[in-house]
Amino acid sequence: MKMNNRYFAALLGGTMLLTTSCSDLDTNPSGSTMGDGQLNEVLSQDPSKLKSEVSGMYANMIEYGAIIQWAGSTRHFDFGYASTMLMMDASGQDEPSQVSGYNWYNQPLRFVDRTANSQPTYFIWNQCYKNIKVANDVLKSVDLENLSDVAKSYVGQAYAMRAFEYFTLIQLYQFTYKGHEDAAGVPLVTEKTTEAEANNN
């Protein structure tokens, strides 16, 4: 009987330990992790810290494996803006290509990558809008009326990167001008666009 009591006590104690929760785990991260609000506060106080955000835009241009999570594995074209340039070259009408086992950019060459669920399309769309978001975050984090010279440099780079990414998108996804003179290009997201507007864009 004493042995059963010991097992019962051990089982009861184990159950109590496993079913109690730690309130320490319910806190927001602090220390090495910053939320958007904290980041904006730091950037507004010291605009030189914008350098890390702006550097992130350039790092996105050479990011390898950007769509691994979406695609399920790496893709041969998933190595940054250089790959986008190759796809744009392959999409031109002056690029002859024979079908071979090594034909990496055969989708753009055959114009079959123009669908919403195409991996090359997702790659380009994701790459461009990721940089547009970072540029918008830089622009949101500073007071555009009172900029220091350092902040002006970073804000200028953010505007330039955003314009460059829209230029890339419009070349690929805009209708031809003839017959579509009033057609919209690509969804426009700026630093002033709300989340609801972006979702309905």
Regions found by a protein language model. Give the residues of each.
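Conserved, well-structured interaction surfaces
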Residues: 97-172
